[in-house]
Amino acid sequence: MTEATQAQPAVPRLTSLSHGGGCGCKIAPGVLSELLKRATPPALFPDLLVGTETSDDAAVYRLNDEQAIVATTDFFMPIVDDPFDFGRIAATNALSDVYAMGGKPILALALVGMPINVLPHETIAAVLRGGESVCADAGIPVAGGHSIDSVEPIYGLAAIGVVHPSRVKRNAAARAGDVLVLGKPLGVGVLSAALKKNQLDADGYAQMVATTTKLNRPGAELAALPGVHALTDVTGFGLLGHTLELARGAQLTARVHYASLPWLAGVETFVADGVFTGASGRNWAAYGTDVRLADGLPPVAQALLTDPQTSGGLLVACAPEAVDDVLACFRADGFDRAAVIGEMVDGPARVDVA
């Protein structure tokens, strides 16, 4: 057999090279909170409008009375095996934090860590092209970045956006009486677990990629709506974790209506069969003491509510009279599953699910 006809080594599955994937590989919220407590607090800068105080989605720094910079970074290990899709999902997820602050992205830098001697260069290039395609869709350049040779594949972006200082939307400004609206269906972590176990069919994969590559573009328009008080996105800490951040920031109780939650097709069946991520359990261990689950919820409820979302939906807290405008804003951009899922009420800083 000549060298030209020798069988080439099989390219490993991207997900086989990482111990976690997507936002499910975040440091557990309880551990992260403890680490941040030990960090040196930043000096007080009057123009730093948003820092680390409430675990918000991005930093915001005021340049002048008309402009503020939104700065964020997000990267993770593969949630899918297709390199182009991996790049698209990671980039969409990174840009989401800019939208979640009410901002508009203007620039991105690529963050790349790859096992250079394990993956073919064309595979790595496909990851980069995937990220670039999403940034092109968002109307921004990937203007540079940084790369390292790493044991596990890692990809993401540092993203810069702009926002008017008066339109910055924090995760700590919800008010009693506000209605909670969620932009995307839940269950990405469950589908990713099914994929890793070779249990996800083509339709399931297609819906997972479709939701995780849909840019949360309505964020800037939502921030401009009267009556929108708080905004965040649902990612690695699951719906309960990010709703709890709203509750803690506002010192209110968030009520979530389980029957109103939108789910990706098949996720409830997968969880009933024992298919879900380890991050779900870590999330519950971190914040479950501040959650009340009503009697009578399905047995799968806890795992689904703590399911880590990668490139998840925007979560809006708005006045009741703004709900129709919020839903219209989502649906105008193709978010057909956007739904009212609960409300904020006076009470201790926790989440009640009924």
From Swiss-Prot:
Residues at the site labelled Important for catalytic activity: 26
Enzyme superclass (EC): transferase
InterPro entries: PurM-like_C_dom, PurM-like_C_sf, PurM-like_N, PurM-like_N_sf, SelD_I, SPS/SelD
Active-site residues, as the UniProt record annotates them: 23
Binding site for ATP: 26, 54-56, 74, 97, 145-147
Reactions this protein catalyses: hydrogenselenide + ATP + H2O = selenophosphate + AMP + phosphate + 2 H(+)
Pfam families, per the entry: AIRS, AIRS_C
Required co-factors: Mg(2+)
Binding site for Mg(2+): 57, 97, 233
A GO molecular-function descriptor: selenide, water dikinase activity
Keyword annotations: ATP-binding, Kinase, Magnesium, Metal-binding, Nucleotide-binding, Selenium, Transferase
GO terms, biological process: selenocysteine biosynthetic process
Enzyme Commission identifier(s): 2.7.9.3
Gene Ontology CC terms, in alphabetical order: cytoplasm
Manner of cofactor binding, per the entry note: Binds 1 Mg(2+) ion per monomer.
Membership in a protein family: Belongs to the selenophosphate synthase 1 family. Class I subfamily.
Quaternary context: Homodimer.
Function, in words: Synthesizes selenophosphate from selenide and ATP.
Name recorded for this polypeptide: Selenide, water dikinase
